[in-house]
């Protein structure tokens, strides 16, 4: 270890070795100031604040995203969502894709798509929507950080404020909306209390807890998609039947639902005929 005495001090305070190393790497201990910052960061982590917020940035696929409590911490499952979306776009054979990222949060999904498409020589344009001005500020910051300019940010509740001229012209709608029901949220890890509640918890529908936002997105997406356009959407592990039924009822074809790496139902894929 770079500084075994400090690592030992942090572990004794209650951090695990991995977190101690991360914090030391991030804040350093070269002088009195950085040492004080390191100890403050350790206190925040020991108080229960997620490491991603304490450090202030976190890797997501090929990006290093700035993160703070204004936005949700992107999950590993959401990295898989990006992979599925890329595969769908490749299958759609679109030369200059128009992508809409609903509820963009930190910008993770849409910006990762732009970056990885650019690596493949594909020039895409992105519209990133979120109803939270705070989230949009973080997403803008992340776009600037990574030099991703083919993106417009719009404050919008789902499709509400999307430019009407895009109706029927979008190649990919991608979304990681709130999908946790209030009852389930109450039973989850209290550390989630640090994250923005509105990005996690959704209203229940008559049949399915936490399904209200997904229902709205699936129902409204078809009209915005171009013929052959794809909807790729993350959802909760108890919502497979609900998302499949909603997508078929909305008029989608090639409707499928994929498991995540842990084997849970997680990603809806559907195509506009």
Residue ranges and their predicted role:
Residues 18-88:
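Conserved AdoMet
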Residues 1-17:
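Non-catalytic nucleic-acid substrate-recognition regions in nucleic-acid-modifying enzymes
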Residues 208-270:
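Conserved Class I SAM-dependent methyltransferase catalytic core
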Residues 178-213:
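Mobile active-site "lid"/loop adjacent to the S-adenosyl-L-methionine
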Residues 64, 125, 150-152, 253-256:
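Conserved beta-strand segments of alpha/beta enzyme cores
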Residues 23, 48, 78, 109, ...:
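Residue-level signal for inorganic ion chemistry
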Residues 113, 191, 217-221:
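Class I S-adenosylmethionine-dependent transferase superfamily signal
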Residues 80-186, 216:
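Conserved SAM/SAH cofactor-binding pocket of Class I
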């Amino acid at each position: 270890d770079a500084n075994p005495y400090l690592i030992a001090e942090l572990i004794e305070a209650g951090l695990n070795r991995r977190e101690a190393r991360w914090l030391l790497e991030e804040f350093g201990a070269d002088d009195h100031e950085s040492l004080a910052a390191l100890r403050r960061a350790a206190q925040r982590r020991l108080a229960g604040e997620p490491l991603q917020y304490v450090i202030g940035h976190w890797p997501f696929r090929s990006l290093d995203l700035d993160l703070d409590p204004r936005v949700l911490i992107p999950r590993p499952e959401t990295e898989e969502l990006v992979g599925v979306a890329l595969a769908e776009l490749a299958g759609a054979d679109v030369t200059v894709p128009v992508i809409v990222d609903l509820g963009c949060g930190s910008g993770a999904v849409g910006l990762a798509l732009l970056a990885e498409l650019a690596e493949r020589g594909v020039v895409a344009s992105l519209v990133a929507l979120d109803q939270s001005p705070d989230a949009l500020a973080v997403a803008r910051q992340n776009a600037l950080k990574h030099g991703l300019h083919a993106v417009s940010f719009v404050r919008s509740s789902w499709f509400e404020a999307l430019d009407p001229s895009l109706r029927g012209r979008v190649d990919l709608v991608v979304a990681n909306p709130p999908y946790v029901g209030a009852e389930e949220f109450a039973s989850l890890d209290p550390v989630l209390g640090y994250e923005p509640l509105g990005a996690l918890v959704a209203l229940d529908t008559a049949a399915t807890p936490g399904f209200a936002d997904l229902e709205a997105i699936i129902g409204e997406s078809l009209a915005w998609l171009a013929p052959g356009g794809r909807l790729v959407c993350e959802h909760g592990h108890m919502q497979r039947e609900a998302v499949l039924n909603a997508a078929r009822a909305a008029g989608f074809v090639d409707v499928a639902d994929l498991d995540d790496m842990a084997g849970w139902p997680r990603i809806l894929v559907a195509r506009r005929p």
